[in-house]
Curated annotation (Swiss-Prot):
InterPro entries: Aldolase_TIM (IPR013785), Elp3/MiaA/NifB-like_rSAM (IPR006638), Lipoyl_synth (IPR003698), rSAM (IPR007197). It is found in: Cytoplasm. GO terms for cellular component: cytoplasm. It is an enzyme of class 2 (transferase). This is Lipoyl synthase. It comes from the Bacteria. Binds 2 [4Fe-4S] clusters per subunit. One cluster is coordinated with 3 cysteines and an exchangeable S-adenosyl-L-methionine. It comes from Corynebacterium efficiens (strain DSM 44549 / YS-314 / AJ 12310 / JCM 11189 / NBRC 100395). It catalyses: [[Fe-S] cluster scaffold protein carrying a second [4Fe-4S](2+) cluster] + N(6)-octanoyl-L-lysyl-[protein] + 2 oxidized [2Fe-2S]-[ferredoxin] + 2 S-adenosyl-L-methionine + 4 H(+) = [[Fe-S] cluster scaffold protein] + N(6)-[(R)-dihydrolipoyl]-L-lysyl-[protein] + 4 Fe(3+) + 2 hydrogen sulfide + 2 5'-deoxyadenosine + 2 L-methionine + 2 reduced [2Fe-2S]-[ferredoxin]. Its main location: cytoplasm. [4Fe-4S] cluster 2 binds at residues 81, 85, 88.
Length: 348
């Protein structure tokens, strides 16, 4: 029996993963830190009101840039997830009882932080009869109620593909409905054993048919091939995905899936061009891009592509579309120049 650092028995997959040492990062996996006035104001507000955001608690490398645009992400549903994905650092265990006061608290946090755009994500709640559909819906409703000038992106699990539960979430009408596919069919079951590739695509398809702006994410470096990435992009577009983010897998610790390869900025740039050629409305592609990174900018860009104007109450988001972002592959190549070969090397 193998014991995890916190004293519990390791899962077999964790024991296998732990045999591969943590990998050394290539030179382009680093972040620029700029503390602008909006970031400083947000930081003071968060500290003063003892607020909690994923941005801080997950140590997101993009916190300075997103907060400068007054965008932030919140995790709902508790600290424990009812499923386990091999790339995700959220604890997999029996979830806590449902906290019905959480939606109001999140909405009040959004108000205190004076956000332009908020992303809601959370754990799966297979323990609940509605799998958390009310919770994901209610937090959108409360944010809209208390913050009419704040956009809301709802990044949700699949609710087992149940149409009635998805319909409840759709009817809360977030500005963007997001469900992350994450990886390609061949390795999907190994990486996300409790999810299904086709079911995730169907979730996006249902959201598109409802009339929502849709979004998904692909994580690279977990064993997929270049051809498989292209196939997944085509599948996502066919399912009705408007916005796609593409990112490098960064291993949270030794119990998680080893990194199979470091994807160069040049390949991320190629994938961005390819995604636009396929027909996506908005694309963000780079090693340190995360699915909620500069989400307001992508929403505004997607509406423009669709020939729609920003709602009057969100017209301020038009300002976020100007200029490149720090983590786009094109920006990395500008800063660091052409990348060198970077094989996956265990940290010595």
């Amino acid at each position: 029996m193998t014991i995890a650092p916190e004293g519990r028995r390791m899962l077999r997959v964790e024991a296998r993963n732990s045999q591969t040492p943590i990998e050394t990062k290539p030179r382009w996996i680093r972040n620029q830190v700029k503390n602008g006035p909006e970031y400083k104001d947000m930081k003071e507000r968060v500290a003063g009101a003892s607020l909690h955001t994923v941005c801080q608690e997950a140590g997101c490398p993009n916190i300075h840039e997103c907060w400068e645009s007054r965008e932030a992400t919140f995790l709902i549903g508790g600290a424990n997830c009812s499923r386990r994905c091999d790339f995700c650092m959220i604890n997999s265990a029996r979830p806590e009882p449902l906290d019905r006061g959480e939606p109001l608290r999140v909405a009040e946090s959004v108000r205190e932080m004076r956000l332009n755009y908020s992303t809601i994500t959370g754990v799966t709640r297979d323990d609940l009869p509605d799998e958390g559909a009310w919770l994901y819906s209610e937090v959108v409703r409360k944010i809209h109620e208390l913050n009419p000038n704040t956009g809301v992106e709802n990044l949700v699990p699949d609710f087992s593909g149940k149409r009635d539960l998805l319909q409840e979430v759709f009817e809360s009408r977030p500005e963007v409905f997001a469900h992350n596919l994450e990886t390609v069919p061949r390795i999907f079951k190994r990486i996300r054993p409790a999810f299904r590739y086709d079911r995730s695509l169907d979730v996006i398809r249902q959201a598109r048919d409802f009339g929502l702006v849709t979004k998904s994410n692909l994580i690279l470096g977990m064993g997929e091939t270049r051809e498989e990435i292209s196939e997944a992009l085509r599948d996502l577009h066919s399912a009705g995905t408007d916005i796609i983010t593409i990112t490098q897998y960064l291993r949270p610790g030794p119990l998680f899936h080893p990194i199979e390869r470091w994807v160069k900025p040049e390949e991320f740039l190629e994938l961005s061009d390819e995604a636009y050629e396929i027909g996506f409305a908005a694309v963000m592609s780079g090693p340190l891009v995360r699915s909620s990174y500069r989400a307001g900018k992508l929403y505004a860009q997607a509406l423009k592509f669709r020939g729609e104007e920003l709602p009057a109450n969100l017209s301020h988001l038009a300002e976020t579309t100007e200029g490149p972002t720090t983590q786009e592959a094109s920006s990395l190549l500008e800063r660091y120049g052409a990348s060198e070969d970077a094989p996956v090397i265990p940290r010595g």
